[in-house]
Amino acid sequence: MKRSAFNAIAVDTKEFQNSTKNLSDALAKAPGMKLRESGGVGSDMQLMLDGFSGKHVKIFIDGVPQEGVGSSFGLNNIPVNFADRIEVYKGVVPVGFGTDAIGGVINIVTNKKRRNWFLDGSYSYGSFNTHKSYVNFGQTFKNGFTYEINAFQNYSDNDYHVDAPVEDFETGRIDKDKRVRVKRFNDTYHNEAVIGKIGIVDKKWVDRLMLGFTYSHMYKEIQTGVRQEIVYGEKHRKGHSLMPSLEYNKRDLLIKGLNVALTANYNKNATANIDTASYKYNWLGDRKLMNSPGEQSNQYSRADNNNWNGTLTVNYRLAKIHMLTFNHVLNTFRRSNTSLLAKVESEDAIAKETHKNISGLSYRLMPSDNWNLSVFGKYYSLYVAGPMATTTNQDDYVRTTRNMNSIGYGAAGTYFILSGLQAKLSYEKAYRLPTIEEMFGDEDLEMGDISIKPESSDNLNFNLSYNRTFGRHSVYMEGGVIYRNTKDYIQRNIADLSGGKYAAKYINYGKVLTKGYTVSARYGFGNWVSIGGNFTKMDVRDNMKTSISSSAENLAYKERMPNLPYMFADSDVTFYWRDLGRKGNMLTVSYDNQYLHSFTYYSSRIGSNKGDYVVPDQFSHNISLSYSLQKGRYNVSLECRNFTDEKLYDNFSLQKAGRAFYGKLRVCFGN
C-alpha cells in the first residue's frame, strides 16, 4: 500500500490484540477517522472519514462487500483479533473494490498465511456486565486441505448512567433544562457469530478454493430513540443470519501474469421488531398506561432479507510495468415484511428489491520504483422496485420501479521526491447509489425514500509523507489536503412524527462543499517507546444558494452542515519492557486520548436557542496495561476507558458511557 498512488493507509492490529478493543476502536487511530456511536455495546455506529460518514464509507472483509450482512458484523461488534490489518482508502477508491463509495473504503484483511495449526482464544469482562469472547482455530495439512473456525460473542447490560430530562407523568411535561442522573434500564445487547471454512490451498490448479458458512444471531433492547428525551421501556429487536460463501483464487491462470479472483455469497437474514407495550416509560423507570399499545408504533413485524453478492476481479500484468484490472460486482436484494400482530400472519403485498451492477477497468503504469500512475473508469447501474406512498399520510401505496445509471472516472499518481519523501495526487468523479436503508428504511426508527437520487462528487486528494530511520530513532510524518464537491448529498435528518415521536429520514441536499486537511506524526525509539498523534479539520459547507424546495434564498448558504464533527484529534504513547521477569516476557503500558471540538446537530442559524443543539467540547483519556508471557503465548490485560469520567456524546447528543474498567485473558498457540 505504501507505493500505491491512492490515498491509503494500513492499520496494523497486532498492537491491539491483547486489548478489549473492537475493529472500530482500532480504526479510530487512523488520520481523518472519527468513530461515532449512539451508546454502548451493540449500539448504532458510524465511521466518519474526511468529512464523510455513514453510507458514504463502504466496508469490506478481504475485498468482499459487507452490505446486508446484519448488525452482528458491524465494526463495533467484531473483535480486533479477527483482523490481521485494516486498509483505509480515502475518497478515491481503486477499481478492484467494485464499489460506489464517495467517502472511502475500509477493507478488513484477515490472516490467510498457510499455517500448520493455530489457536487464538480470549475472554474479557468489564463494566456494565460486559462479556466478550473470541476463538479462532484451524489447520492446513500437507496435501493442501485446510479448515478454519472463527467464533465470537458480545454481551452487555449497557446499564450506565446518563444525564437526561425526566417526563412528569402528572403534568405530561418534560423540562429539558433540568437534567437528572439516571440509569439505563432497557439496553441489553448480545450477539453471537460463527464462521466456518474448508477448502484447498496451494495446488497447481488453484491457489485457494474455500467453501464457507456463517451464522449469526443478535438481540437488542432499545432504550432511546433519535433524541435522548425519548424513552422506551420494553421495545426491542432480534434477528439471525445464514450465509454460505465461495472463494476462488488462481495466479497465472492459463498464461503468466493473469490472476483471477472470484467470490460469491448468499445472505438470508430475518429481523423482528417488537413494540407492543401498553405502557409509556420515563427515565426513572416509571410507567403509565397508554390509550393504545406501542411505544413508538404498535408493531410486531419480521423483515426477511435475501441478499446475493458476487465479485469477479481479473488482473493482467504485462512486461512488469503494465497492469490491467477488471472488476465486476453484482448485488441483488429482496425484502418482504410480515406482520405478526394478528393470529394469522399477513405479508406486505409489495416486496422491496434492488439489482446493482458495478463494473470497473483500470490501467497502471509502473516504469520505476520512484513513480507510478493509474487511470480508471467505472460504470454504475441500479434497478429499484418497491412501494411508494400515494397519500400525504402514507396510508396507501403503489409499486414503483426506477433505473439509475452513471459513469465515473479518475486517475492517481505517486512520486518519490527523495528517499523516504513521497507525494500522492488522486482525483475521481465518483458516484454513490442509494443504500437499502436510505430507500426502504429499517422498518422501525429509520424512514426510507424510494425516490432518493444518487450522489455524485468530484474528489481530489493530495498527500505528502516522510519516513526515515536514524539508528534507533524512527520518524514518520504525513499531511494531506482534500477537496470534495458533492451534488445531491444524501443527508440523515430527524422527522417529527405525531404524538411527540421522532424517526430518522433521508433527503437529497443539493450541493455540499468539503475542504480539509489531516496531519499525523509518529516517533519510535528502538523497541522501547512509540508516540504519535493525528489532527483533522474538515470544513463541510452548505453550497446551495437557494432553498431545496423553492427558489427562495437559502439562509444556511455557506454555513457548516449540521451534526458533523469538523475538528478532532488523538494521541497515544506506548512503553515496552521486554524480557521483564523472564526472557520472552513483555510488559506494555499504553495511554491514549481523543479530543472532539464542539459542533451543532442542527443548522447554526437556528436562532436564540442555538445552545440547546450543541454537542460540547470533549476530551477523553484511556489507559491500559498488558503482560505477555512466553513470546505472547499467554497474555493478561487491564484497561480503564474514559478514566476522568467525561461526558461523551456523538449522534444528536446521545450520551455514551462514563468511566469503565475491563480485563482480558488471551492464549495463542501454533505457528
Where are these regions (language model features)?
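Face-selective signature of the C-terminal outer-membrane beta-barrel domain
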Residues: I195-M218, R237-Q394, V398-S419, S426-E428, ...
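Periplasmic-side early beta-strands and strand-to-turn transitions of outer-membrane beta-barrels
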Residues: R115, S124, K142-Q228
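Short acidic/polar hinge/loop motifs at secondary-structure boundaries
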Residues: V64-G91
